[in-house]
């Protein structure tokens, strides 16, 4: 919880200690000479950090104090963060606003809290697509795209004194690299610190930066690794490799996979082999005591952790990832199985890295690892202050491991050796060997290939700056590090965009006396159109197409919002798979032949409500609002599907069998909640939509509260210190029910889900839901038999789901923390003599995100 974390920091003895050594930002006098800055900073490093700086750190900070740019191309663990601290401190002492940029929000957020701790909350702010905290602070943490857009919008006039660009190897990213290049080209008065462990040859970047800013660029690339690495290639099975490393005390071990499924498969295998001691398992059990593993994957994780095996990948809930990181930081996990995401911003101290392959699927094809990818992963081995060396082990391909096993079994017996049948690589398999490994070890990271693009958003940001926007866009292209052919294509693209903006009367020009032109916009452009919700204006316009009196109005609003969100691909694939499976069964029953079934199957995909209407509206919108051409709609039904099927988080995960993608679903639900809460005007919300928004908040917050708290305490315009004070206020009495509307919807959905399953005659699913409170499969079979003896069917229409058939008694809310609820079943005869009745455990329900009962019955 960000605000709570800020409150805790305020009690730290060293909180804000570096910021206290700088002049107050609001004072007029802020010019301390460089010698004094150097002395104050390194005294603080010695007294507070308790470390002695390395020569390359001192050199980098002296270069920065001299006004030079610095490219810090030094190994993982070599103290790049300390150099960035020195830059921020120097900026604070000289009245310059400084920026820290990173590629992912999680890393930006982590750095924000780190900087708050040393500089004080009044000196540090954060800006991401959906979060603004103390945005006028002298030190700003933000994503690279935020700074790039500001650079385009404000140019040389931007209040950006210096920038520490972390993970600068993203300069070579084909999709996002433009955001790392643009500031270098458009901020001539800004000082840059470019940092990464895997930059490769940066001479071209240094030359370009020096030419653009007329300032020297110092490259520091000769720092030794604080913890040297040793390398080992093995044909032992993975379990044996881990067992041997464990026996030699070479833990913690991070086993790197290139898919989430493979990571879980290995974790399960290792959990049964005994990779932890009795003492370690006892310590882990104590450390996770009180942790709630409420989801399907949570129960898997709990079992793995108790054996000493962790798992870490992007598909997990954030709180589970943080738990694994915390246990690793405490030295409690001997083995962690994860994906290659550990290379960016993941704080997991490890001694040994084991690569299960030297190839990966890049979204298009299987290929061998690039040198940069290899060093990014391998560089995490070896813990500064703990290890004298780190270990990097690469596993051979599976077929080679089996061949080695067969040869070892044959021993030195010539006859047996002759009989060994060597396996070959499967057809089309991209293989590797020890030579591949050796080449990767010796290879320097590839020279970064620059990337640039021109979009409507970029052009409009330049127009917003005033003056001759076309000249500046042409200069941006000409100054870029792209090839002549690429520049020609970029100029052509700029021609198209400017012509579109003129044709649609979005921009106009005025001639200047000096022969130049001034560009200006004729329409108001949303302040955040290029950030996290660029299609919000379209959504507001599209809402006018809906009839508020329609019974589907709330669901249609949800479908419109969902169409503007990023796809949760694993969830959509599961929906499509289930739809195709059901269609295949129907087609077989209808007697269709195989070829026809296959042809029809290709046409079946996941649900896309309002697709035709939305696409027609969007086509018209793009004609009037050209910058929307940078984006696209993606109709889908996840929130709507959950509402229509009365599903909670756990039930939805089970329904589509996506336990390994819990984090993906939760992030999507969180994004949907934010979009609904922020974008849909109050006057466009009916009672049902307000209920759904509240329910969604309860679901997200109960599964992982940080995703809601981070936005509500920080992103909705609340000052961080104010949020901290609010959350830390002593004596605050918490209500038993935090969000009555949302919790009521959660309970009503749970009750009606049972009604839907009664209609489908699904005693197995009902029993799975209710076995913990005495209504297992057999009890439900008996209840359904009795019900259908009296009535022909169950209604599940809007009337059956109405509030008239749901009764809530909250008289014991405060005394017993419970609600008595009764869902009357709308039977075929309209007798309404059957009902599901239960006493809801409010505390457990709110913490778990699914309804938990004290007692329960189904009867007439």
Language-model region placement:
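Helicase-associated low-complexity/disordered flanking segments
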Residues: 1-62, 66-70, 275-306
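Conserved interdomain hinge at the start of the Helicase C-terminal
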Residues: 232-258, 265-268, 322-331
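Compact beta-sheet-dominated globular domain cores
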Residues: 826-860
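SF2 helicase motor core recognition
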Residues: 150, 332, 336-353, 380-389
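Conserved P-loop/Walker A NTP-binding site and adjacent catalytic elements of P-loop NTPases
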Residues: 44, 50-228, 234, 252-277
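Conserved C-terminal RecA-like helicase domain
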Residues: 99-101, 109, 116-125, 261-335, ...
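Conserved segment of the helicase C-terminal RecA-like domain
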Residues: 352-355, 359-361, 367-408
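Non-catalytic terminal extensions of ATP-dependent helicases
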Residues: 310, 329-330, 413-416, 421-764, ...
């Amino acid at each position: 919880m960000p605000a709570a974390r800020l409150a805790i920091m305020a009690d730290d003895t060293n909180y804000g200690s570096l910021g206290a050594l700088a002049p107050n930002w609001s004072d007029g006098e802020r010019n301390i000479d460089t010698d004094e800055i150097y002395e104050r900073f390194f005294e603080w490093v010695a007294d507070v950090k308790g470390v002695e700086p390395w020569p390359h750190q001192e050199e980098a900070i002296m270069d920065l104090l001299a006004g030079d740019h610095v490219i810090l191309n030094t190994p993982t663990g070599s103290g790049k963060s300390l150099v960035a601290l020195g830059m921020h401190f120097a900026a604070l002492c000289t009245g310059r606003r400084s920026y820290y940029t990173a590629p992912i929000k999680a890393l930006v957020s982590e750095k924000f809290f780190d900087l708050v701790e040393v500089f004080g909350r009044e000196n540090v702010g954060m800006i991401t697509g959906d979060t603004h905290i103390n945005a006028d602070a002298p030190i700003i943490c933000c994503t690279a795209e935020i700074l790039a857009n500001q650079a385009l919008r404000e140019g040389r006039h931007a209040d950006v004194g210096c920038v520490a660009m972390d993970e600068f190897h993203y300069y070579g990213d084909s999709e996002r690299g433009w955001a790392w290049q643009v500031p270098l080209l458009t901020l001539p008065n800004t000082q840059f610190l470019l940092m990464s462990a895997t930059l490769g040859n940066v001479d071209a970047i240094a030359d370009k930066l020096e030419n653009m800013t007329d300032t020297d660029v110092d490259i520091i690339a000769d720092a030794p690794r604080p913890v040297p690495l040793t390398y080992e290639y093995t044909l032992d099975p993975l379990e044996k490799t881990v067992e041997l490393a464990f026996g030699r005390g070479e833990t913690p071990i991070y086993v790197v996979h290139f898919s989430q499924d493979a990571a879980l498969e290995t974790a399960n295998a290792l959990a049964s082999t005994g990779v932890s001691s009795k003492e370690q398992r006892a310590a882990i059990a104590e450390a996770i005591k009180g942790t709630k593993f409420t989801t399907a994957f949570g129960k898997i994780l709990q079992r793995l952790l108790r054996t000493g095996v962790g798992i870490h990948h992007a598909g997990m809930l954030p709180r589970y990832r943080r738990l694994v990181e915390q246990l690793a930081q405490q030295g409690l996990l001997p083995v962690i199985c994860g994906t290659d995401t550990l290379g960016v911003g993941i704080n997991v101290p490890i001694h040994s890295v084991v690569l299960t392959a030297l190839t990966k699927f890049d979204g298009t094809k299987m290929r061998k690892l690039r040198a940069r990818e290899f060093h990014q992963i391998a560089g995490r081995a070896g813990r500064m202050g703990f290890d004298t060396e780190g270990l990097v082990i690469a596993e051979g391909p599976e077929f080679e491991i089996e061949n080695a096993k067969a040869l070892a079994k044959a021993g030195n017996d010539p006859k047996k050796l002759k009989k060994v049948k060597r396996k070959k690589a499967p057809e089309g398999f991209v293989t590797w060997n020890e030579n591949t490994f050796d080449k990767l070890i010796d290879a320097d990271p590839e020279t970064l290939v620059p990337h640039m693009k021109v979009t409507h958003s970029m052009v409009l940001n330049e127009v917003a700056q005033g003056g001759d926007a076309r000249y500046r866009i042409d200069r941006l292209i000409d100054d870029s590090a792209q090839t002549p052919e690429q520049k020609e294509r970029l100029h052509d693209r700029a021609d198209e965009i400017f012509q579109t903006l003129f044709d649609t009367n979005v921009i106009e020009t005025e001639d200047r006396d000096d022969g130049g032109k001034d560009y200006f916009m004729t329409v108001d452009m949303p302040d955040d159109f290029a950030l996290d919700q660029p299609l919000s204006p379209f959504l507001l316009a599209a809402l006018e197409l809906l009839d508020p009196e329609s019974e589907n109005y709330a669901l249609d609003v949800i479908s419109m919002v969902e169409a503007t969100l990023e796809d949760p691909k694993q969830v959509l694939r599961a929906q499509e798979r289930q739809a195709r499976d059901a269609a295949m069964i129907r087609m077989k029953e209808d007697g269709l032949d195989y070829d026809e079934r296959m042809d029809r199957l290709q046409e079946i995909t996941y649900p896309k409500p309002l697709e035709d209407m939305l696409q027609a509206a969007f086509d018209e919108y793009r004609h009037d609002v050209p910058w929307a051409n940078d984006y696209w709609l993606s109709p889908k039904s996840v929130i709507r599907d959950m509402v229509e099927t009365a599903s909670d988080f756990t039930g939805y995960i089970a329904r589509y069998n996506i336990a390994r993608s819990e984090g993906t679903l939760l992030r999507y639900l969180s994004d949907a909640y934010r979009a609904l809460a922020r974008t849909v005007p109050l006057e466009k919300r009916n009672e049902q939509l307000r209920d759904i928004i509240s329910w969604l908040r309860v679901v997200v917050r109960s599964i992982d509260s940080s995703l809601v708290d981070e936005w509500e305490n920080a992103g909705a315009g609340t000052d961080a210190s104010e949020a901290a004070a609010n959350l830390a206020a002593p004596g605050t009495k918490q209500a038993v029910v935090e969000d009555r509307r949302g919790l009521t919807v959660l309970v009503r959905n749970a009750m009606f889900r049972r009604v839907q399953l009664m209609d489908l005659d699904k005693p197995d699913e009902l029993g799975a839901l209710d076995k913990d409170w005495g209504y297992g499969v057999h009890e439900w079979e008996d209840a359904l038999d009795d019900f259908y003896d009296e009535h022909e069917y169950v209604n599940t229409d809007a009337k059956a789901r109405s509030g008239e058939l749901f009764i809530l008694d909250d008289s014991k809310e405060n005394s017993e923390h419970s609600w008595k609820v009764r869902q009357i079943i709308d039977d075929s005869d309209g007798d309404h003599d059957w009902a599901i009745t239960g006493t809801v455990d409010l505390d457990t329900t709110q913490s778990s995100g699914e309804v938990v009962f004290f007692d329960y019955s189904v009867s007439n």
